[in-house]
Structures are given as C-alpha cells and as structure tokens.
Curated annotation (Swiss-Prot):
Keyword Cell inner membrane: no
Entry's Gene Ontology molecular function annotations: GTP binding; GTPase activity; translation elongation factor activity
Keyword ATP-binding: no
SUPFAM superfamilies associated with the record: EF-G C-terminal domain-like, P-loop containing nucleoside triphosphate hydrolases, Ribosomal protein S5 domain 2-like, Translation proteins
Pfam families tied to this protein: EFG_C (PF00679), EFG_III (PF14492), EFG_IV (PF03764), GTP_EFTU (PF00009), GTP_EFTU_D2 (PF03144)
UniProt: GTP binding residues: 28-35, 94-98, 148-151
Family statement: Belongs to the TRAFAC class translation factor GTPase superfamily. Classic translation factor GTPase family. EF-G/EF-2 subfamily.
Residue ranges of domain tr-type G in the record: 19-234
Record-given protein name: Elongation factor 2
Main location: cytoplasm
Gene3D superfamilies assigned to the protein according to its UniProt record, in alphabetical order: 3.30.230.10, 3.30.70.240, Elongation Factor G (Translational Gtpase), domain 3, P-loop containing nucleotide triphosphate hydrolases, Translation factors
Compartments where located: Cytoplasm
Location of Diphthamide modifications: 598
Length: 731
C-alpha cells in the first residue's frame, strides 16, 4: 500500500472523529509566502514532491495562477498529522492575498474554523493582513500566526539576536492589536496569539524550517543558533532539525479548534434557524445521523465532472446518489460524487459526515453561498456571506460572432455562480453584457478565462468605473401620486447618519426587512432616535425606509409593495441610473383608496418610486466614487516622484515614514485614476519600488467633475444626457 493510499484510508477513518479534525485556512498579504507554505505542507504530507515544493504550486492548480505567481481562487487539500501519539485530519484551504480576489478569502473563512495568518518578517503587517484578519474574525474563525521569511532578516538585513527579537515582537504586538480590535467581544483576549503558549511560529517556508517555543524547549534551539546556522549556510540542516510541516501542523492541532468545539459558537452566528430544533441540535452536537445541513462556499467547473462544489458540512452526512435541496434557489439535485480534496485531485469517498469540508458534483444551478439540505427535511438558510469589498470596475463584453451570444449569456451566468463577487448584467436584446469586479486584475482574469477555458471569442471594452448615488442635503416632503390619482405617499430623504452607514459597511448591522424589535436596540446604540429606530421597516443598499405615519388605514396591506418599490428605486437611482446608497427615507403620511383593486402593484409601485426619485433630486444629489488606499515602498530618492505621480491622479498623502534608506508612503487615490499605475510607479522608482492597494470605500465625487461624469454615464446607458429634475417625477 503506497503512502498516498494509506493516507486516504486514514482520512476516511478520521472523517468520523470530529475531535480529531481541524478545518483551517492559510491567509496573508500578497507575496508573504502562503502558497509556498501550503506546498511545503502538502510535500510534508506526501501529496507533492518535496523537491518541487515552493515551485510546484500544488495549490495553484489553474494555468493563470501559475503564470502570474499569485493565488486567484481558494484551493483545498486534506492531510493527516500525528501529534502526541494521535493522528489528526487537517482540511486545508489556501486563499488569495491580492486585493482583487478577497471574495475567495471571505468564502473560505465560512468553511473553516481556524486560520494560519502568514506575515512576512521583513514587510511586517500590511494592508491585506488586516483585511484577511478582519474576514476571519468576522466569521468567528480563530487565528494563529506564522512569521515567514525570518531567514531574510538574517541573510539580507544582517540582524543580530536583539534586533531580530525586536522586529518579530513588533509584528506580534501589531497582530494582537488587530485581533483585539476586530475579534468578537467574548473572544478578544482568548484569541490573541501568544509566543509562550506556542500559537506563534517563526521560520522560512521557502527553506522549509520553522520554530516556536514548544520546539525550542524540545530541541534546546535558540534564535542565536538559528542565526549561526543561517550565517554558516547550513539551512538545509535546519529543515531536518526544525521541519516546517511538523511545527506548523502541531501548532494548528494544539491551538485551533476542532469542529465540535467551533460549531457551538459559530453556528448561532451564521445560521438564522432555531438552535433548539432538530437541525440546530444536529449542528451543535455534531450528529452524522441527523438532518443534512451544509453550505457551498465555492463552485468551479471541471471539463469532465461538470460543476464541482466545495461544501462545509455542518450537520448530518452528505451521501453519493442522495437527493438534496438547494434552499436559496429552491431546486433539487442528485449528488453524483461526494468526497474530499487532495490538492489538484478529488477523492470520491461516497460519504462525507458533519465537520468536514467536502466536494460534491451533480449540483447544477448551485452557486457559492447556497445552503444545502436533504430534500425531505428543508432547513432555514445560512446567513449570506458578507464580502468586505464590492465591485468597483466594469467592462462591457460582446461575443465576436453574433451566433455565440446564447453561449456567452450561459457562460456569464456560470461565471457569476462561480464567483459571487462578480456582478453580471445581461442585456439579451442589445447583446452587450456588463461584468463588474473588484479591480482591473480581477476582470482581466475573468475575461481571460472566458476566452481560454470556455473557448469563446469576445470583445472587451475599456474598464468603466462603478459609481454610486447619494444626497448631500435634506429634501422637503414630496408627494408621490399613483397613476389613477387615488393613492398618495408623502416622503422626504436625507443622508443616513454616519455611525449607521459605517456599521452597515462593516457588517455590524444586517440588511433586510425588519422582523424583530431587538433590531431597534442596535440602531439606538448607534445614536438613532428611539422612535425612528422602532419604526424602521427596511434596510437596503445601506439605506433605511422608516414609517413615521400613524393610523393610516390599509397601509399594512401595501407595505410589501412599498418596500418592493423602495428597493427597486435604489437599484437604479435618478441621477445616473447607478445604485443609490446611504439614504434615510421617512414616510410621514399616506392616503389610500379603500378598494384594494385601486391600490394594487400597478398603482403603488410607480407612486413610491416617483416619490423616492423626486425626493433624491430635491436633496442635492451627488455621485460617490470608489477610493483605493495605495501603499508605496521605495528608496528615499524616489519619494518626490511618487508624490508627484499620486497628485496627478487626484490622490492625497495620508502618511509617510522613513525606515533607513526606504520611504514608506500611504495615499488615497480614486480608482478612476489608477489605470496604468503599476507601469508608471515602476518608471517613477526606477523599478525599485513596491506597492500594494486596498479598497477604502466610496467618497463624494468633487462637485466640479460631477456634471461631466453624470453625462458620460447617462449617454453610455442610452439615457438623455441631463438628469430629470424633481418636477418630472411629481407631475
């Protein structure tokens, strides 16, 4: 029996022992070494050749990932680790570090219970380090820390023991400060990483060695010994004495939770159903015999197997040939295969019980974020996955040959299922389709995959920026009349209070129609007026619809229509047909016809939409543009060039500091001005500068630019160049 066959047999056995399972993600800022780390863990487990680890890119299975040298999708593998005489099943997900692919990180965090956060010893904590930590902690995922590239501090920067310790300590302090500020209230202290306890490891993924305090105690090795070995060129000996796989996976087993521990506190946060119900107790008690409850976190298309879905099983057992129900899309599917991932391979195990990360095929129509259950026991949906970033750049695509239009539409629908952070708008009449993504690289990868993987020739437009609409002022009360003039609604709008808006962006407040009184307390704690807080009907697009009327007959009967109209109006605002956000609408009065026939959808929907549009156009409407944080590191002599380039892009400097001969600069720049930035900054720094970016959010577009950009957007969309005034909607 080969080593691989023995491992598969052991995995099949350990799958049924939740206390011996660890579901973990590896996440980091781009180029901090997490895929090299993943490869070496796979090599240590015998899944790829040790000689190729770090070059094999065992977790980067797509051609474009290997060509670019970055991880674009999340990749999975299961392996076995022995710790203190017991064997453990480690289900591992490697995630992207590039800001454009943060959606994969968020979805991966829903599938795992623990995360190995990788930080480069030279760069320290970087923008995406904070973002991936935020994504993990928001999903109640416990972190441990691996400080990578320690050999560079010794070999390149020539740090001695004291300087080395100072640099490593500063990284740990910074990571713990982030954990303390971002972790759930009851986990802030418990989840901070601790060197003495062994939840921090140091090493070199590339050179394949690592050490933490437990390993130091076992081997009597010190940092001085490590410095000596590096200086003497004996790092090959280090990997024998301090094997990376052993140190890292032992840390994972000891400090990250098993599913039967994690699901007790995670399930109530990510599932809206009744915890005391049979399904709820199946998840809390980890019963493989109870009702099936799972969530699909990723969808990919394989040319042989069709749709391959990654699914975390929270309750029951996923079985081959069983019929399952897709709760979100209200459809049934028959499972063709069910099993586990081993890097680029899948192993069909026939069954996958609670607590594991599974793959399944046969689920046509499934998309990431879908809840699955048994067809004969339908459950409540899991909470939607909140993505930290949102689409900010759009391209228009058309089929080169008109006859390929139906195929293009089908491919685009598939793309949006595989990656929910991609937003697709399909216009079957004109043949033009819009794809919106997280950035230039995100869209380049998606369009290249359509051309290369789907074998479809397409024409791709220049990138277009995604704007949003809002208001700067407070409108008067506006009357909206139904077409038959028998129904009238009185509405005004103003900007939503900043604490509420920020809480919606951060995910601290949930969107949706308000069903419970408890939600009002959350609004009040953020400074909202008590009476208004109790009367919020709907939260949508980071905006609120508040009913402040009293004793209006028949209002409850048209409530759903009013909210439908409110949501529809915000999808396409009146200024430029872009999404409207950050608004607070007050319904202060209404007059309704006594006969239900005269207050149906054809009357109520246009009345409320017109009132909303007129109120927005009466409240100093504005456009919001997406802003990126840009971090540049370059030799001091290039600092002036960097500042000049950023200022030419309407950017502003936020901070800068000097580290030896290197300047580190923080800027904020409109994404509209970031095209071609990589090449320009290379020229400005003589090829010696590095930069990284992070989405900051949306800010008000300077007023002197607004009219021109509104005209451009409206013309591109086939609308009249000038927006209508409020009187157009009040007529």
């Amino acid at each position: 029996m080969s080593r691989r066959d023995k491992m598969i047999a052991k995995i099949k056995e350990l799958m049924y022992k939740p206390e011996y399972i660890r579901n973990i993600g590896i996440c980091a800022h781009i180029d901090h070494g997490k895929t090299t780390l993943s490869d070496n863990l796979l090599a240590g487990a015998g899944l790829i050749s040790e000689d190729l680890a770090g070059e094999a890119l065992g977790m980067d299975t797509k051609k474009d990932e290997q060509e670019r040298g970055i991880t674009i999708d999340a990749a999975n593998a299961s392996m076995v680790q022995e710790y203190e005489g017991e064997q453990y099943l480690i289900n591992l997900i490697d995630t992207p570090g590039h800001v454009d692919f943060g959606g994969d990180v968020t979805r991966a965090m829903r599938a795992v219970d623990g995360a190995v956060v990788v930080v480069c010893a030279v760069d320290g904590v970087m923008p995406q380090t904070e973002t991936v930590l935020k994504q993990a902690l928001r999903e109640n995922v416990k972190p441990v820390l691996f400080i990578n590239k320690v050999d560079r501090l010794i070999n390149e920067l020539k740090l001695g023991p004291e300087e080395l310790l100072k640099q490593l300590t500063s990284i740990i302090v910074e990571v713990n400060a982030l954990i303390k500020s971002l972790a759930p209230k009851d986990k802030k202290n418990e989840w901070m990483v601790n060197v003495e306890e062994g939840s921090v490891a140091f090493g070199s993924a590339f050179k394949n060695w690592a050490i933490n305090i437990p390993k130091m105690q076992e081997t009597k090795f010190t940092f001085k010994d490590i410095i000596d070995y590096c200086n003497e060129g004996k790092e090959d000996e280090l990997k024998q004495l301090l094997p990376l796989t052993e140190v890292l996976l032992n840390m994972v087993v000891k400090h990250l939770p098993s599913p039967n521990v994690a699901q007790v506190y995670r399930v109530p946060k990510i599932w809206d159903g009744d915890i005391e119900s049979e399904v709820g107790q199946t998840m809390i008690k980890m019963s493989p015999d109870g009702p099936l409850a799972g969530m699909i976190t990723n969808v990919a298309v394989d040319k042989h197997a069709g749709i391959v879905a990654t699914c975390r099983i929270y309750g029951g057992t996923l079985e081959k040939s069983s019929e399952i129900y897709l709760v979100g899309s209200h459809g049934k599917a028959r499972v063709q295969q069910a099993g586990i991932f081993m890097g680029a391979e899948t192993i069909d195990t026939g069954k996958v019980p609670v607590g594991n990360i599974a793959y399944l095929t046969g689920v046509k129509g499934a998309s990431a974020g879908e809840t699955i259950c048994s067809a004969d026991c339908i459950i409540d949906e899991f909470e939607p996955i909140d993505h930290i970033s949102e689409p900010v750049v759009t391209v228009a695509v058309e089929a080169k040959n008109t006859k390929d239009l139906p195929k293009l539409i089908e491919v685009l629908r598939q793309v949006s299922k595989e990656d929910p952070t991609i937003k697709v708008e399909i216009n079957e009449t004109t043949g033009e389709q819009l794809i919106s993504g997280m950035g230039e690289l995100h869209l380049e990868v998606v369009t290249n995959r359509i051309i290369n993987d789907k074998k479809l020739e397409i024409l791709v437009s220049e990138p277009i920026i995604v704007y949003k609409e809002s208001v700067l002022g407070h409108s008067p009360v506006i009357e909206g009349k139904s077409p038959n003039k028998h129904n009238r609604f009185y509405i005004d709008v103003q900007p939503l209070d900043k604490p509420l808006y920020d809480a919606l962006i951060e995910g601290d407040l949930k969107e949706g129609r308000i069903k419970t009184k408890e939600t009002a307390q959350d609004f009040i704690e953020l400074g909202m007026d008590k009476e208004e807080a109790r009367r919020v009907w709907d939260v949508y697009n980071r905006s609120m619809f508040i009913n402040m009327t009293r004793g209006i007959q028949y209002l409850d009967e048209v409530k759903e229509l009013l909210l439908e109209g409110f949501e529809a109006a915000l999808k396409d605002g009146p200024l430029a047909n872009e999404e409207a956000v950050g608004l607070k609408f007050i319904l202060s009065d209404a007059k309704l016809h006594e006969d239900a026939v005269h207050r149906g959808p054809a009357q109520v929907l246009p009345a409320i939409k017109k009132a909303i549009y007129a109120s927005i156009m009466s409240a100093n409407p504005c456009l919001l543009e997406p802003i990126q944080k840009v971090f540049i590191s370059a030799p001091l002599e290039y600092m002036g060039n960097c500042n000049k380039d950023i200022q030419n892009r309407r950017g502003r400097i936020i901070g800068q500091e000097t580290k030896g001969v290197i300047a580190e600069m923080d800027f904020e720049v409109p994404i509209a001005k970031m095209f071609g930035f990589a090449g320009d900054i290379r020229s400005a720094t003589g090829g010696k500068g590095d930069f990284s970016t992070e989405m900051k959010g949306f800010e008000t577009l300077p007023i002197y630019l607004q009219d021109d950009i509104v005209r451009q957007i409206r013309t591109r969309k086939g609308l009249s160049p000038e927006p209508y005034g409020p009187e157009h909607y009040s007529a």
